[in-house]
Amino acid sequence: MELSIQKIEALIRLSTIVMLVLTACLIGLDSQTKVIFYVQKKASFKDLRALVGLLYITSLAAAYNLLQLCCSSFSASYKGTSLQSYAYLAWLRYILDQAVVYAVFAGNLAALEHSFLVLTGEENFQWLKWCNKYTRFCTQIGGSLLCGFVASLLMFSIASISAFNLFRQYSPTKFMHLKL
């Protein structure tokens, strides 16, 4: 069962990396130029600060998951003897997995809110609707947000597996004692 959980976690991490890289590429390569009244106007992800933040967050999350994938493949070939050190590493992985899930989900929500304002506009602040002029730009941002939320769900499952791997090391009868 141990090996199958590791394989499932590796497969989910690989899928997460693909979705995060796809999100970052869709955001980073998105721009559209239109001629409006003989003036060229360009819409880019750099115009929306939440998208710039999401680009950085998804890139760092993909790098973190790649690092964890490499570490887990290395640890699968090397079995440590100290159960105590493995517990510390399991705690570290659990906390980092939780932090990355929350960061990516929060970044996606911030970008979604900013994109919603771009979609609908806001008369009180004199913000114009962009999506009636830059349709391809808005469609591509919508696709990147969808990929980002799928990556968040995948990372939630990784965090659940990480929690399972952590708490199965402890005794069910003695509070916070490792199994021997």
UniProtKB/Swiss-Prot annotation:
Side of membrane Cytoplasmic, spans: 1-7, 71-98, 162-180
Chain ranges passing through the membrane: 8-28, 50-70, 99-119, 141-161
Topological domain ranges for the Extracellular compartment: 29-49, 120-140
Origin superkingdom: Eukaryota
GO CC terms of this entry: plasma membrane
Subcellular location(s) of the protein: Cell membrane
Pfam families: CASP_dom
Membrane-topology descriptor: Multi-pass membrane protein
UniProt xrefs under InterPro entries: CASP/CASPL, CASP_dom
Keywords for the protein's UniProt record, in alphabetical order: Cell membrane, Membrane, Transmembrane, Transmembrane helix
NCBIfam families referenced in this protein's UniProt entry, alphabetically: A_tha_TIGR01569
Family membership: Belongs to the Casparian strip membrane proteins (CASP) family.
PANTHER family on file: CASP-LIKE PROTEIN 2C1-RELATED, CASP-LIKE PROTEIN 4A4
Subunit relationships: Homodimer and heterodimers.
Listed name of the protein: CASP-like protein XL3
Species of the source: Gossypium hirsutum
Gene: XL3
